[in-house]
């Protein structure tokens, strides 16, 4: 017969399991998965970024995106852009990075996106015509959050929407047993055509989650109380799969010190401030406000900064037909940096060559473009691929970003 002590301990254990949405305290790493099925389309990336942040898209940019000589990627004006868990480039030029996630009983490949706060997936609720080439969540009616819905919409009326479920989500070594899963009932053409990506896992702040009538917690916020440390770190790489580290900092992945700064989370993003920028060996003092966003491919910043950069690139020009700054692919590109927390965060020049704009590989599209229409700077994968970036959100202190030079650079 069990003792009162052992029975009490057992009941306490059961109560803890019921009360907690995750199974155990943990620290883990998730590796990305690469795809090499299409060439990058620089103008289309700009279109997707503008739409992601709810900004109007100039017709000239749409025209440039449509006329891009891409292999395996057709862009139309109606399209919508957008652990250590491994992150894999979704094309041969590192256009995006995907990571395996088990949602319910299905493993899908999701875009880990620090610029949004929704965990949404393709699902069995969609028409079969939208599911071709995708892995998708098998919706379980018993786990439906009745009365809840979600919708991501863009200026042209396109987007994605659906129902909300409370289900198991496994990322790397941790399981959230009651995570809000936004199951799509309908998605627009660009999402359904992109068979590389089965949805998004948002890692911005839960305040901008789109679920109605009540925003839901991100995966990070759900598992954070159970992590060894209340943080995740991003280690994207140049022409290679990167990782997401949850609950710990991997000292083997960076060199030098980590520079920490407080985050401006007033808009729900991982916002930072810089005091200067550098082009080659020249540093210019200038206040820059921006966000770090793994769901955006390029860097978008103030026009004066972009002009100053390409002024140092032989043959560079603003090409409206291509939708941005281009240069001879053979050009030597200077390093670029922003000063954050008193430390210059350097992006190697070779990272700023985004992709060719023609089949001959003569002219290339720049990885740094103007932020016209965005109202802020966005430091996407072009910036992040040379960094180890710590995202810390302790319950008793302001959120912080930590930046260090990646050991893989």
Curated annotation (Swiss-Prot):
The name on file for this protein is Aspartic protease pepA
Task: State the GO CC annotations.
Answer: extracellular region
> Molecular function (GO) terms listed?
aspartic-type endopeptidase activity
Which parts of this protein are propeptide? Answer: 20-65
Q: How does it assemble?
A: Monomer.
Lineage, opening ranks:
Eukaryota, Fungi, Dikarya, Ascomycota, Pezizomycotina
Q: Where in the cell is it found?
A: Secreted
The reply to whether Transcription regulation figures as a keyword in the UniProt entry is no
- Source taxon at top rank: Eukaryota
Give the function comment from the record: Secreted aspartic endopeptidase that allows assimilation of proteinaceous substrates. The scissile peptide bond is attacked by a nucleophilic water molecule activated by two aspartic residues in the active site. Shows a broad primary substrate specificity. Favors hydrophobic residues at the P1 and P1' positions.
Listed CDD domains:
Aspergillopepsin_like
Name the protein family.
Belongs to the peptidase A1 family.
Q: Which residues form the Peptidase A1 domain?
A: 97-404
Signal sequence region = 1-19
Annotated catalytic residues: 113, 293
List the PANTHER family hit by this protein, alphabetically.
Answer: ASPERGILLOPEPSIN-1-RELATED, BETA-SITE APP-CLEAVING ENZYME, ISOFORM A-RELATED
Enzyme superclass (EC): hydrolase
Which residues bear sugar attachments? 335
